[in-house]
């Protein structure tokens, strides 16, 4: 019976065949232990000399790392194994014998591993992180489908930047200037006025010259937009969504979390509602904690976000930022025009902001004024202004950075490990 490691528990005490790669091996006298992987998981294959004979045993000992095989054996329950099972090998066929695999069991430097990222993703821990990434994506689609959202795909090539930033990748679009998208938000607002509730999932590009463990040049965003949803309701949707994906990872990625040594008790407590602290109170809190490098009107740095997050036992919303710190499209607080109806969701354990969101401006004249204040072309944003001319409604949205979220949930030490092929400052290979 041909099967996969993920399904091997269905065949206890039965003979099965796996298509697999040899991740590692060791031998002890008359027993050889083969660490096998097939993409769905890892399992130990046990080759007993007395059962397979001298010839097969010697073949097993001579197998090279990352050789591809068809392995046949009997499935046994084993509580000590991460998957709960092991395979007593009866025979195997070599599909392709690998030679001089560069990533050996010894320690390697980060640059070496990044140069061999196309191979590094095969390793147990990298595989676990990317499996968790996959589960977050799956749970994202499930959550938004169950809550009545329509998936919409905004363009990646745009003629303008949604936040009026200079951190853009420029290209020529025939005879016009074009830019790689930093956000699909403006297009998603248009889609929300057609479908009510929408979300997108796609790559975004920021030419930031940052070398922190939180930054990538190319990263993936989940961006929902919702018509007839005001600020507080948007926060509720955000916290329910984040709690949903965390619980989905706990349910479906227990082996991966164990492989990574993740403290799951931290994740088990992630349930809505999340605490909220206003920007004003956050500044006061930081001053009380001895931070003298920040004043009202300044944006938070990583140390500030970490200090605020450490005060709470779950993700925390920082709300009502100064208008001067935020993009042009955010709705002002009706009680204070110097702050806007926005929130950043800060993840625990030093992972920083994972969501930025706000209620969007719905008034035509105010939006036009904000565009002018930010020196943005009214012609370029004419279509966006149109949304406020024909049946404008209160609406809100947010963007979740997938890689930072994967990093937090998996406990990965650097955001470069949370995407298969990271694009970093000075790294475009492989």
UniProtKB/Swiss-Prot annotation:
Keyword terms: Aminoacyl-tRNA synthetase, ATP-binding, Cytoplasm, Ligase, Nucleotide-binding, Protein biosynthesis
Molecular function in Gene Ontology: asparagine-tRNA ligase activity; ATP binding; catalytic activity, acting on a protein; nucleic acid binding; transferase activity
InterPro entries per UniProt: Aa-tRNA-synt_II, aa-tRNA-synth_II, aa-tRNA-synth_II/BPL/LPL, Asn-tRNA-ligase, Asp/Asn-tRNA-synth_IIb, NA-bd_OB-fold, NA-bd_OB_tRNA
One GO cellular component term: cytoplasm
Keyword Transcription regulation assigned: no
Keyword Protein biosynthesis: yes
Principal location class: cytoplasm
One GO biological process term: asparaginyl-tRNA aminoacylation
Domain of life: Bacteria
EC annotation from Swiss-Prot or TrEMBL: 6.1.1.22
Coiled-coil annotated residue ranges, if any: none
Catalyzed reactions per annotation: tRNA(Asn) + L-asparagine + ATP = L-asparaginyl-tRNA(Asn) + AMP + diphosphate + H(+)
Subcellular location: Cytoplasm
Subunit structure: Homodimer.
Family under the similarity heading: Belongs to the class-II aminoacyl-tRNA synthetase family.
Protein name from the UniProt record: Asparagine--tRNA ligase
Species, as recorded: Halalkalibacterium halodurans (strain ATCC BAA-125 / DSM 18197 / FERM 7344 / JCM 9153 / C-125) (Bacillus halodurans)
């Amino acid at each position: 019976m041909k099967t996969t490691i993920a399904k091997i528990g269905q065949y206890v005490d039965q003979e099965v065949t796996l298509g697999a790669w040899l991740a590692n091996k060791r031998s002890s006298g008359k027993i050889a232990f083969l660490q096998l992987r097939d993409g769905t998981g890892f399992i130990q294959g046990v080759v007993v000399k007395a059962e397979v004979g001298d010839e097969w045993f010697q073949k097993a000992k001579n197998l090279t790392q990352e050789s591809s095989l068809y392995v046949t054996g009997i499935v046994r329950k084993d509580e000590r194994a991460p998957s709960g099972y092991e395979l007593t090998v009866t025979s195997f066929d070599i599909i392709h014998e690998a030679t001089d695999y560069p990533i050996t069991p010894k320690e390697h430097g980060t640059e070496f591993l990044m140069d061999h990222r196309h191979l590094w993703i095969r390793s147990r821990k990298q595989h676990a992180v990317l499996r968790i990434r996959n589960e977050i994506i799956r749970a994202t689609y499930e959550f938004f489908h169950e809550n009545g959202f329509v998936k919409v795909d905004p363009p990646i090539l745009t003629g303008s930047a949604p936040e009026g930033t200079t951190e853009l990748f420029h290209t020529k679009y025939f005879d016009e200037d074009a830019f790689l998208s930093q956000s699909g938000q403006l297009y998603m607002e248009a889609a929300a006025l057609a479908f009510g509730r929408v979300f997108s999932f796609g790559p975004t590009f920021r030419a930031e010259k940052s070398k922190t463990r939180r930054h990538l040049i190319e990263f993936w965003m989940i961006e929902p937009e919702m018509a007839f949803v005001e600020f507080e309701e948007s926060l509720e949707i955000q916290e329910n969504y984040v709690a949903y994906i965390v619980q989905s990872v706990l349910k479906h990625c227990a082996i991966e979390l164990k492989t990574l040594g993740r403290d799951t008790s931290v994740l088990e407590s992630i349930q809505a509602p999340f605490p909220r602290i206003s920007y004003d109170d956050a500044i006061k809190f930081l001053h009380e904690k001895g931070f003298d490098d920040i004043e009202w009107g300044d944006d938070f740095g990583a140390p500030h976000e970490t200090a605020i997050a450490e005060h709470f036992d779950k993700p925390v919303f920082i709300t009502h930022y100064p208008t001067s710190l935020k993009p042009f499209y955010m709705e002002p607080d009706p009680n204070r025009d110097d702050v806007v109806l926005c929130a950043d969701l800060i993840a625990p354990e030093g992972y920083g902001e994972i969501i930025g969101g706000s209620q969007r401006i719905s008034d035509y004249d105010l939006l036009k004024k904000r565009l002018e204040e930010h020196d943005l072309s009214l012609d370029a944003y004419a279509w966006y202004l149109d949304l406020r001319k024909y049946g404008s409604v209160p609406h809100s949205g947010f963007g979740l950075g997938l890689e930072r979220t994967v990093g937090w949930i998996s406990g990965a030490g650097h955001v470069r490990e949370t995407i298969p092929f990271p694009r970093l400052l000075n790294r475009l290979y492989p």
